C-alpha cells in the first residue's frame, strides 16, 4: 500500500452562546457523518479566511474567527488505486454572529446546534472530539469529562445507528 504525503486543510469550529454554549456541526455530503466545515487552502487567503469561507459555504454561518488555530486533528482517506491519503486539519474557532437561511451547500448538508457533550458524542474522529471538548471547556470555564465508554464501543454504536438509519 502506498502512503502519500500529508495534505493541509483548514476548518472552522462554529460556536455561540444561546441555550448555553453550543457547537455547530454539519453532515458530510457523501457519508452524512457529523463534521465541522473544512476545506483546502485558498490562494490569496489566510488560513483563518479559508476556514471562514468553508463555514459560509458548508454551514451558512459567519462570524469572528480566532487569529490562530485552536488546535488540529488528522485523518486518513483511502483513494481509488489503494493510495492512503493523510490530512492535517488546522481548526480555527468561529464565534457565530450570522446564521443564513440560504447558503451554497444548504441542499447537500444538515446543520445542527448542539451542546459540547452532544457534539463530541456525534463526531466520529476521536481527535476532533478531544479538540471540541478542550475548546468548549476553555470557553465555558468548565472542563468537559472524557467519555466513560471506550472509543471502540462508541465507534460500534455509531456504525449500528447508521445501519439502522438513525444517524
List PLM regions with ranges.
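Class I (Rossmann-like) S-adenosyl-L-methionine-dependent methyltransferase catalytic domain
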Residues: 1-5, 15, 76-80, 145, ...
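Residue-level detector of alpha-helical recognition elements and their boundaries
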Residues: 27, 66, 70, 107, ...
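Charged phosphate-binding loop/patch that engages nucleotide di/tri-phosphates or the phosphate backbone
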Residues: 126-167
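Short, flexible helix/strand-to-coil boundary loops that buttress conserved ligand/catalytic motifs
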Residues: 38, 123, 136
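N-terminal strand-loop-strand
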Residues: 1-37
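Unchanged
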Residues: 41-130, 163-167
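Aromatic side chains
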Residues: 10, 15, 34, 73-75, ...
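Generic N-terminal leader/processing signal
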Residues: 36, 56, 115, 154-156
